[in-house]
Amino acid sequence: MAALGFVGGQGMSDLITMDDLSNDEILDILDAAERLLPVANGDVYAPLLQGKVLGNLFFENSTRTRMSFESAMKRLGGEVVNLSSVGSSVAKGETLYDTMQMVDGYSDIAVIRHPRQGAAQYSADAIGIPVLNAGDGAGNHPTQTMLDLFTIRQAHGTLEGLNVVLVGDLRYGRTTHSLSHALVRFGAKLTLVSPDSLRMPNEIVGDLQSHGADVAETENFAGSIADADVIYMTRIQKERFPDEDEYTKVAGIYKMTADDLAVAKAGMIVMHPLPRVDEIHPSVDSTQHARYFQQAFNGVPTRMALLCRSLGIEVPKEVGE
């Protein structure tokens, strides 16, 4: 279906990193996602993507990202074809290049998650249809960042000048890599909480600071709660560790309970890209601060807006009318 003329490779309709979006584009997409909330909830039917096919390619495990993209496409009237490394020719040794050629012919747009950093850009360069990066190893996860920004703005009414605390696996956590770059563009103050072995990579911290970002690094989680507007918890990603003994040393190092939040601002929100292991005790779920389940749902309207953008479909001001 590449003959339809959608732009791939370095084209503007791809989303590989947050650098592919200007601040104005970010805000426009969030506005579109807001208008699409009734569609995501199933209250309004808006077949904006009728006749379009999404190729959903997941070479790593996923629940929320895969399902929310599928829900987003179908609620907008589109169709989805799914591919994973199990049960496809990938298991027979087919190269990523060859797989992407097939997707180019079967779909109008592709979403890819892959364990290799850079795989999303490689795929975008290889085919003509738009490609959305759903996570490339320890690299980037821009569609997660967009739903995170949507959730933050939903709670605070703005993205400007917030105090954001990122906690946990900041070395391998692609969600925090993408989110930190986006937040500093809106003047956020970042506090990076991690054990020394899981610090945010130096090149990322250096890049943030070179753009004038206010970035502090610490291992003290408890001391970072009181001033936070957002606390973004992450799990320690066992699958990224080359040595299980190294994982064991840091597993469970940060655990949030409801009691920890006694010093928090009333409007502070707790986020998590999920799945959680033991970083957030279930006692937090019923507090006014918990936003992680709403955050996960917000993947549907946000990814609706991203699909429409990449396919050149305008989201009307009054959806469903």
Predicted feature residues:
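Helix-enriched interaction subdomains in cytosolic or periplasmic regions
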Residues: 2-31, 114-142
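Positively charged, low-complexity intrinsically disordered leader regions
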Residues: 3-71
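C-terminal helix-to-coil terminal segments
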Residues: 8, 286-321
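Glycine-rich phosphate/diphosphate-binding loop of Rossmann-like nucleotide-binding domains
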Residues: 59-71, 154-233
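Short, structured coil segments at secondary-structure junctions
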Residues: 76, 106, 126-128, 186, ...
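Rossmann-like adenosine-cofactor binding region
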Residues: 206-284, 289-290
